[in-house]
Amino acid sequence: MSPRRAQAVLGTDGDPAAALREHLVDTAEALLAERQVNTITTRDIARAANVSDGVLYNYFADKSELLLTALVRRFTELVERLRTELPDPGSGTVDANLRLVAGALYDLHAAAFPIVGSLLAEPALLHRFMAAIHSTDEPLGGRQIRDTVVAYVVAEQKRGRLARADPGAAADLLIGATATLVFTGHLGEGRDPVERLPAVVDTLIRGLAPQRRKR
């Protein structure tokens, strides 16, 4: 037994089955980072994981289920990273915080774009992926991302640091603008999209700045 196989079987929690399943998901995720989803075969995954082809079917119904598990896990990690990167309401300045929010959203879209892009060649798997991340039990898609940004805006509004504008609209503007910048960046249009983030935030801030009372 090779060291790699032994490590996968033994794991850290003493459960060989769980450890091997995790090893298969890790392997699939690594392959997805290097190749298009429609080029990955069951044999490719098995060879990379150093197991026989049939082992995959002890844990997953088929190759698509394994790839879907890896894709959803990766996207879950991206959403969780977004949540940890957002600033605490009331800290620093609103201008600086919104720039951090925009930057975090841009990074999320930039990392997620290749995932969704690779799935365009596999419509059935794309449909399953979208259903999984928007499931009612554990929404990980646009709703959770939007709710996270809305919560930050509302918290700043309660502190009087942002005007009482529609927080959902503010979140939509930030999410939509950063997604567009990532998309146009992949098309190679215009200057570096990251350089355009400050202008997006400045425009939003002008609409959200608290109105000063006239004396």
Where are these regions (language model features)?
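Short amphipathic alpha-helical elements of helix-turn-helix/winged-helix folds
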Residues: 27-31, 69, 104, 177
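Helix-turn-helix
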Residues: 23, 31-65, 69, 73
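Amphipathic alpha-helical segments that line or abut small-molecule/effector binding pockets
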Residues: 26, 92-117, 168, 172, ...
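Amphipathic alpha-helical packing segments from all-alpha helical-bundle domains
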Residues: 96, 110, 114-118, 126-159, ...
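Hydrophobic/aromatic residues within well-ordered alpha-helical segments
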Residues: 20, 63, 70, 74-75, ...
